[in-house]
Swiss-Prot record:
Biological or metabolic pathway of the protein: tRNA modification; tRNA-queuosine biosynthesis
Family statement drawn from the similarity comment of this UniProt entry: Belongs to the GTP cyclohydrolase I family. QueF type 1 subfamily.
Pfam families with a match to the protein in the record: QueF
Name this polypeptide is given: NADPH-dependent 7-cyano-7-deazaguanine reductase
Molecular function per GO: preQ1 synthase activity
Gene Ontology BP term (one): tRNA modification
Amino acid sequence: MSDKYQQRRFDIYGYEKIDTEVLEAIPYEYPEKNTVVEYITEEFSSVCPWTGLPDTAKLTIRYIPHQKLVELKSLKYYLTSYRNVGILQEHAVNRILDDLVKLLEPKFMEVIGEFHERGGISTKVVARYEK
């Protein structure tokens, strides 16, 4: 009996589909404070780079802003651009951290991806930046 799933793949896009251009920063009026800002979404998704099967996660972005905040609609569009990108879970979390640090230059940032179980294993990835 042949494995009818062996040759099946879904469309998988490369990293070039990650839309960093949509990200916008807005001025932060309290740079002298160490206020912690936290954004949480249960809707993050990307795909396995080998099979195209979806990887879904709860994503938490926590940071201490310096001069800038991320504009939330732009963040939503940016995160949605990962939807059909073939990227490892560990790489997705680090890429998000790198892109947001470049945009915002925060005092501190942490991105946590809690990926839902696949093959009996769930994955939690924590990436941090400190100035």
